[in-house]
Swiss-Prot record:
Belongs to the TMP family. This is Trichocyst matrix protein T4-C. Structural protein that crystallize inside the trichocyst matrix. It is found in: Trichocyst. The lineage of its organism: Eukaryota, Sar, Alveolata, Ciliophora, Intramacronucleata. It comes from Paramecium tetraurelia. Transmembrane segments: none annotated. One of its GO terms (cellular component) is trichocyst. Its main location: other.
Amino acid sequence: GAVGEIQILLNNIASQLNGDQKKADKV
């Protein structure tokens, strides 16, 4: 459903933000 798709998009955004934070921590 639409709600599930939105949750997936939010999860993708969250994972991308987490990845950016991890990269920043390494620097």
